Amino acid sequence: QAARMPVFPAGDSERNATLTHLSGALTWIFGPLIVHSSTRPGSLLRREAAKAFNYQLIAGGVFVAAAIVFGILGLGNLMGLVWLGWLGLTIAGAVKAGNGQDWTNPLTKFTKVTPLDPSGR
């Protein structure tokens, strides 16, 4: 039987990057922004904080747009699907960061909106 790779390696940077992505679920853009502002330029944690911030900002816009469109069309019940998509991509970003993978969120790729430089500068 092959050895299992841990979902979250023991490194502090990866663990903190994971928590930074997950902080977006509780603090929206503010948790990732605080982490980004308080870390060294070029560090893994700063890069992941920028990615988390950018995604949460875009997702906030998607929530507002979806609420307006679904409200006009009388499809407010579909907001639950938008929320599930947001939660899934937030968790995916956290897992990828925890595994040390340089992953770009599909929503960020699609919109190309990056107010914070994802290279960590």
Language-model-derived ranges and their functions:
Residues 8-19, 53:
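Short, Lys/Arg-rich cytosolic juxtamembrane segment immediately N-terminal
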Residues 40-62, 95-107:
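Amphipathic, cytosolic membrane-interfacial segments at TM-TM junctions
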Residues 14-41, 68-88, 108-118:
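Hydrophobic, aromatic-rich membrane-embedded alpha-helical segments
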Residues 1-7:
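N-terminal leader/transit sequences and adjacent low-complexity N-terminal tails
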Residues 81-102:
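Hydrophobic alpha-helical transmembrane segments and immediately flanking/interface helices
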